[in-house]
Amino acid sequence: MRRGKFPGSLTDRQDVVVTLPLALPFKPMLAKLSRELPAGDGWSYEPKWDGFRCIVFRDGDGVELASRKERPFTRYFPELLDPLRASLPDRCVIDGEIVIPDREGRGLDFDALLQRIHPAESRVRRLASETPASFVAFDVLALGDDVVLERPFAERRSLLADAVRPTPPVYVTPASTSAAVAADWFGRFEGAGLDGVVAKRLDDPYVPDKRVMIKVKHERTADCVVAGYRIHKDGQGVGSLLLGLYDDSGGLQHVGVAAAFTRAFRTELLTELEPSTHDAVEGHPWQDWVEWQASNEPGRRPGNVSRWNAGKDLSWVPIRAERVAEVSFGQLEGGRFRHGVSFRRWRPDREPADCRYDQLDVADPVAFGDVIGAAAEGG
């Protein structure tokens, strides 16, 4: 029987010894990106939840939540602890996702989820009440003294369905062996803020830290104004481009960044954009952000300290807002692109003033409950 210690918990105790057969450090199984859903026999499909990946360790009254990167989540989501005790077996390890349903019934609210990672306990408690989270289970890793990683997914899915007593805010994700149902989910549930669809082979074991599953994500393109950039963390070249879209009032809204460039392209971008930095501050659409950065005053700005890494430099270099880039993105939420945005090409044939929100094709809202209710559909 493996014994281990949980890192930090809601009470900041470091001596919580677990008798589960699995303990931290533990890295979850991952998914590799595909442009098409795999078809044929032997596959199971699930909605791809857009939240925080979370491994739940329950040992009697002890419940600990661990992130994909093995960081403790427990103190940030105290409202989940009692529901998890009520819904999960006494001793188990469950893989799933923490999400926050929008209270107005428009799907998931990822921005509200981001706000939950905060160092002040008073704010943690307040947000737990104002924007309560849910947990969606989609795999089981251990039950009692048994590690079930080597068992095929079809068997693990059956164990999960029998083990979890779904009661809000704890759920079991819908699943189907029908590719037609999965294709329907892919299109229909985008409006709920879901990323796409995940496919798992019914005979696959659970392989920690390996890309065994298949994920198919939504992708669209947009023309955006490039209004600044950040230097790469190694100090060599451009690490990311700051993107903007004009709203109906004529304001240029910061909608995200394009990044993940090759080393050669980072250097090329720095050389190409350097002339655009000249006289860029005066009249810049984000001049107030530039001035805030120069004064180093605290506040929520593009140059603020990262919530995830206090040592991360988010300072940026303004350029004249004259360049247009075509980018690919997955989702738009709260007026901003979600997750990574990919640079495709420069568009010298486009005018910055034409880079508006109304060019975007946005999915109609779908309620969180409609997604959960899909479990009753074809299997």
Which residues make up each language-model segment?
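Catalytic cores of nucleic-acid ligases and guanylyltransferases
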Residues: 1-379
